[in-house]
């Protein structure tokens, strides 16, 4: 097949893959994504940084060959593997077959992971690197920075010193698929919305590590050298401080005066309560978002929770437990550990027909997920006017607590 590489700097090319059709990736909904790979061409050698998802070798290789032709080079001399996960290593075996003399540069932890995924690479030459190690391509110098648990134990960044390009793998990424490659080539609100969703669903539990790594980058004197950030998904950041500042804000719990109301319902009673709570919150002048789990996707909901000062979570009781869709969200929130950014206020609510129990379980699980549950509203069957007034007041009080 034919596919064009995209020049992003002198001797540096995007050679990734466009996945137009992807709609769900380990529970995360999206409208396609990219698997970004980059070819760095020096006077004495060529390095390929990361690769792509299994089954996409032909597209990736077509772009690599196009870039090689543009610079008058014949082969890839070095393979850089910033991260083991298959959306960035999925064609590594084919690359090794095509360029058998090219050593694979990665962290020591990554070697173990790659061999577990791809046993046929046992005969490949691996070069393990640590923070500060360099690879000289002749006029192009790659410096490696270990970033364990950002977001896997094997992860690392690669910095192209001369151009100030940070190849950050998953960090600073977005799940977007479009012909444009640079941040400034698409509307900013689309870019930042995708970056926020990516952070909320993938980086939130790592927030303290994000801040720690930023401090390390500053101490090493690398921050002022970064002129561009090239992640492994989505757009390339030509204004790197925009996303660095956004990550700092998200990691430190900078939130809006917003209440996000999330619920599911069987016969409409919990919906009535949700709407009353939303009205109460709005009466305090804060922003309000309302999601029904029967209709809305959890990865979109989590994106709004990231910038919300409080949430209200509602479910009817079924078999003495919360409605299943709400239980699913609770387990997801417990894993995301939002309290590592900020302990957000919360209230729980719902209707029941027997002994109840859903609100108590939700309160307990939200506390485990790092939320401060300030209120609990439960009604028998259909809420009365007085009970809806109580929901309104609960929403108003919740909003008042987060007003600055």
UniProtKB/Swiss-Prot annotation:
Q: Which cofactor does it need?
A: FMN; Fe cation
The UniProt induction remark is: By iron limitation.
Q: Please report the stretch or stretches of sequence annotated as the Flavodoxin-like domain.
A: 259-399
The first-level EC class reads oxidoreductase
Example of a GO MF term:
metal ion binding
Q: Where does this protein hold Fe cation 1?
A: 83, 85, 151, 170
A Pfam family of the record is ODP
How is this protein's function tied to pH? Optimum pH is near 7.5.
Query: Which amino acids does the record list as binding FMN?
Result: 265-270, 317-320, 351-356
Question: Which EC number(s) does UniProt give?
Answer: 1.5.3.22
Which reaction does this chain catalyze? 2 reduced coenzyme F420-(gamma-L-Glu)(n) + O2 = 2 oxidized coenzyme F420-(gamma-L-Glu)(n) + 2 H2O + 2 H(+)
Give the UniProt keywords, A-Z. Electron transport, Flavoprotein, FMN, Iron, Metal-binding, Oxidoreductase, Transport
- Kindly state what the record says about how the cofactor is bound: Binds 1 FMN per subunit.
Locate the coiled-coil region(s) and give their ranges: none
Q: Does the keyword Manganese apply?
A: no
Q: Where does Fe cation 2 bind?
A: 87-88, 170, 233
Which SMART domains does the record associate with it?
Answer: Lactamase_B (SM00849)
Q: Which domain of life is it from?
A: Archaea
Share what the entry says about its subunit structure, partners included: Homodimer. Homotetramer. The tetramer is composed of two functional dimers.
Q: Give the protein's biological function.
A: Catalyzes the oxidation of F420H(2) with O(2). May be involved in O(2) detoxification, reducing the intracellular O(2) concentration to a level allowing growth at the expense of methane formation.
According to the UniProt entry, the note on domains is: Contains an N-terminal beta-lactamase-like domain harboring a di-iron center, and a C-terminal flavodoxin-like domain containing FMN. Two monomers assemble via a head-to-tail arrangement, such that the beta-lactamase and the flavodoxin domains face each other, thereby forming two separated and presumably independent active sites.
| Family, per entry | In the N-terminal section; belongs to the zinc metallo-hydrolase group 3 family.
UniProt-recorded name of the protein: Coenzyme F420H(2) oxidase
Q: Name the encoding gene, please.
A: fprA
């Amino acid at each position: 097949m034919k596919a064009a590489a995209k020049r992003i700097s002198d001797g540096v090319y995007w050679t990734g893959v466009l996945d137009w059709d992807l709609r769900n990736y380990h529970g995360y909904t999206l409208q396609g994504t990219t698997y970004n790979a980059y070819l760095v061409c020096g006077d004495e050698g060529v390095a390929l940084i990361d690769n792509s998802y299994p089954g996409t070798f032909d597209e990736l290789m077509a772009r690599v060959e196009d870039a090689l032709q543009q610079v008058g080079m014949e082969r890839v001399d070095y393979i850089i593997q910033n991260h083991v996960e298959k959306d960035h290593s999925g064609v590594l075996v084919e690359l090794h077959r095509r360029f058998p003399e090219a050593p694979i540069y990665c962290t020591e932890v990554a070697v173990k992971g790659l061999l577990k995924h791809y046993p046929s690479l046992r005969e490949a030459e691996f070069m393990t690197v640590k923070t500060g190690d360099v690879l000289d391509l002749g006029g192009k110098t790659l410096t490696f920075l270990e970033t364990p648990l950002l977001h896997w134990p094997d992860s690392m960044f690669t910095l192209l010193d001369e151009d100030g390009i940070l190849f950050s793998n998953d960090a600073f990424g977005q799940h977007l698929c479009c012909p444009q490659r640079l941040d400034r080539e698409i509307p900013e609100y689309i870019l930042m919305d995708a970056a926020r969703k990516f952070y909320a669903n993938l980086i939130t539990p790592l927030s303290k590590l994000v801040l720690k790594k930023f401090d390390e980058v500053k101490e090493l004197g690398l921050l002022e050298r970064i002129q561009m950030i090239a992640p492994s998904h989505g757009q390339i950041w030509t204004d790197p401080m925009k996303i660095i500042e956004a990550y700092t804000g998200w990691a430190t719990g900078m939130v809006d005066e917003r209440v996000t109301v999330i619920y599911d319902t069987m016969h409409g009673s919990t919906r009535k309560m949700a709407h009353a709570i939303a009205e109460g919150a709005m009466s305090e002048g804060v922003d309000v978002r309302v999601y029904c789990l029967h209709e809305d996707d959890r990865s979109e909901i989590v994106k709004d929770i990231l910038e919300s000062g409080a949430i209200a979570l509602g479910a009817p009781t079924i078999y003495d437990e919360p409605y299943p869709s709400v239980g699913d969200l609770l387990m997801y929130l417990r894993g995301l550990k939002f309290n590592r950014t900020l302990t957000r206020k919360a209230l729980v609510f719902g209707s029941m027909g027997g002994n109840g129990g859903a609100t108590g379980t939700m309160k307990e699980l939200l506390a485990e997920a790092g939320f401060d549950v300030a209120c609990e509203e439960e009604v028998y069957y259909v809420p009365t006017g007085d009970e809806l007034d109580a929901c309104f007041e609960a929403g108003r009080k919740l909003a008042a607590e987060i007003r600055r």
